[in-house]
From Swiss-Prot:
GO terms for molecular function: guanyl-nucleotide exchange factor activity. SMART domains: RhoGEF. CDD domains: RhoGEF. Coiled coil: none annotated. Has a role in the control of cell polarity and cytokinesis. Involved in bipolar growth and septum formation. InterPro entries: AH/BAR_dom_sf (IPR027267), DBL_dom_sf (IPR035899), DH_dom (IPR000219), Dynamin-Rho_GEF (IPR051492). The lineage of its organism: Eukaryota, Fungi, Dikarya, Ascomycota, Taphrinomycotina. One of its GO terms (biological process) is vesicle-mediated transport. Residues 72-268 form the DH domain. This is Rho guanine nucleotide exchange factor gef3.
Length: 525
């Protein structure tokens, strides 16, 4: 019985591949020379082994580096989260131990100057911290999760920050502008012995829950915190890389916009200092002259006709805004005068009308229509003494008072623009002669301030004017409707009146004049 074919082939291959061991004097090198295919196989095996070891080593190193990077990113995220929570905690401590407790200890106006915007900021910061705390925790969990990145829910710290940045910039910017005045108010309180002692008690209680030591240190925290956001975001951006942070591209945008917002806050403070300096340079006599004459228009025309005007940067848009400011101020004054005149003439008209009808009802007392004329007299009396007074009160509250406040708001912009015109004239002359003075160093910043702030102020002034005109139109409509409702019923009764028995107005007036002359003449003896 023969062996199966597979065993036969294996036996043949073994015999053909075997070398005589007894007579073998070959070394390993000789064997490899005889079988070059072995050399290739062994070299490939060594290469694969070496590459496997190298790849394992590289994978281990990259894993260690990735974990180290993740640890650094998580550390930054935790710092952001914990520092934001601590900051909001300090804001609430300041609210409890200072704002709430001082509300009945200091003047209401001073308390409002110090804490009004601070409390608004505290509310916004609390809402922001709640959302940011959750987003930062989600980002940390996203980094620690070993799932595939495409399967993970992607949080977005940068997107959340960008959505909040406009609101934060607005409230923090307002607070930054008045922060210096807040410090002066607190300094004034410290000079009052009773308030100072009470503040020390507040300090002692606040120190139990916070590391801040007095009210000043609490009130400066918002500005410090807002300026720290770019540092935290940049630190996170530098330590992160694409793929680790879910919104790495948006994170770069958040860094850029937060830096712009911080620069904007610093610029607002510098602008405020420039504006205060400009207002301080305007004396009371100059202000009265400025607000009561067309001196600004004359100065604008003189500056526009100057040959040196081209040396003033951005002079055309600024002069256009200044001209609009002056004309808006004049129009608002004229509007207030026109409304006051209309109220005066309305009161005068109905008072005279009532006086005439009352006198005429006396002349008609012996006629059938006497009672009806008496009703009209009463109705006109109600209009003259009731409806007109209500009209005046409504106009005073809803129209004239807002217009007067708007006119007062024009004071500072008009004074600042007057200072700018003077500096522009001096700047153009010094520019041509290449001689500069120290008081002109702030001129470019003042120009930038007018370029940005005047359009906003003019828009606000237009809105106030529109609201006042609409309110006045509604008050007028209500007044005329009241007159119609009061007069229509009594006047309608005259449609059925027989006027034949009513004496003519000429005969009545003649009789009255004759009687008056007889009473005034001396009696004969």
């Amino acid at each position: 019985m023969s062996n199966p074919r597979m065993f036969q082939s294996r036996g043949k291959r073994v015999v053909s591949d075997s070398l005589p061991i007894a007579n073998s004097t070959h070394t390993l090198e000789d064997t490899l020379k005889l079988r070059p295919d072995w050399t290739i196989a062994l070299s490939q095996h060594e290469t694969e082994t070496r590459s496997t070891r190298t790849s394992c080593s590289t994978t281990t190193e990259s894993t260690i580096a990735m974990r180290s990077k993740q640890k650094a990113i998580i550390s930054v995220l935790e710092e952001f989260r914990d520092s934001e929570a601590a900051y909001v905690h300090d804001l609430h401590v300041a609210q409890r131990y200072y704002a709430d407790r001082l509300s009945d200890r200091v003047k209401k106006s001073e308390w409002k100057d110090v804490f009004e915007i601070f409390l608004v900021l505290c509310k916004q910061a609390s809402l922001f911290e709640i959302e940011m705390h959750k987003s930062l925790n989600d980002e940390i969990n996203y980094i620690l999760d070993d799932q595939d990145a495409c399967l993970k829910p992607k949080p977005s710290v940068a997107q959340l920050f960008l959505s909040w940045l406009p609101k934060l910039s607005a409230v923090y910017g307002r607070y930054c502008v008045i922060q210096e005045n807040i410090g002066k108010k607190v300094e004034k309180w410290m000079k009052n012995s009773s308030i100072s002692e009470y503040l020390q008690e507040c300090d002692s209680m606040a120190k139990i829950e916070s590391n801040s030591w007095n009210l000043d240190s609490f009130l400066v925290k918002p500005v410090q915190r807002f300026l720290k956001y770019p540092l935290l975001l940049n630190q996170l951006y530098r330590s992160a890389s694409l793929g680790i942070i879910s919104d790495y591209v948006l994170l770069g945008e958040a860094c850029h916009k937060s830096e712009i917002a911080s620069q904007r806050m610093n610029e607002l403070k510098r602008r405020r200092d420039i504006i205060i300096t400009a207002l301080d340079s305007v004396s009371n006599s100059q202000e009265v002259l400025l607000l009561s004459t067309d001196s600004i228009d004359k100065k604008i025309a003189k500056l526009q006709n100057s040959t040196n005007i081209f040396y003033v940067p951005e002079h055309e848009p600024i002069l256009a805004f200044v001209h609009q400011l002056s004309s808006s101020y004049t129009n608002l004054l004229n509007l207030r005068s026109a409304i006051c005149d209309w109220l005066k003439f309305s009161r005068y008209h109905y008072l005279k009308f009532f006086t005439f009808v009352e006198a005429y009802s006396v002349f008609c007392k012996d006629t059938k229509s006497a009672d009806k004329w008496a009703l009209i007299s009463v109705a006109l009396d109600n209009i003259a003494k009731g409806a007109v007074l209500r009209l005046t009160e409504q106009c005073q509250t809803s129209v004239l008072r807002p217009i007067s406040n708007g006119i007062l708001f024009f004071r500072n912009p008009l004074c600042v623009t007057d200072v700018w015109i003077k500096k522009a004239t001096a700047f153009s002359k010094r520019r041509q002669s290449q001689v500069f003075e120290e008081d002109l160093e702030s001129f470019p910043l003042l120009s930038n301030c007018l370029l940005e702030e005047l359009p906003l102020f003019l828009e606000m002034a237009r809105n106030v004017t529109d609201e006042c005109i609409l309110a006045f139109a509604q008050i007028q409509a209500t007044f005329y409707d009241t007159i119609q409702k009061v007069l229509e019923p009594v006047v309608a009764k005259f449609n059925l009146t027989d006027h034949q028995d009513i004496p003519s107005i000429e005969s009545i007036m003649d009789f009255t004049s004759l009687r008056s002359s007889m009473e005034s003449s001396p009696k004969s003896k």
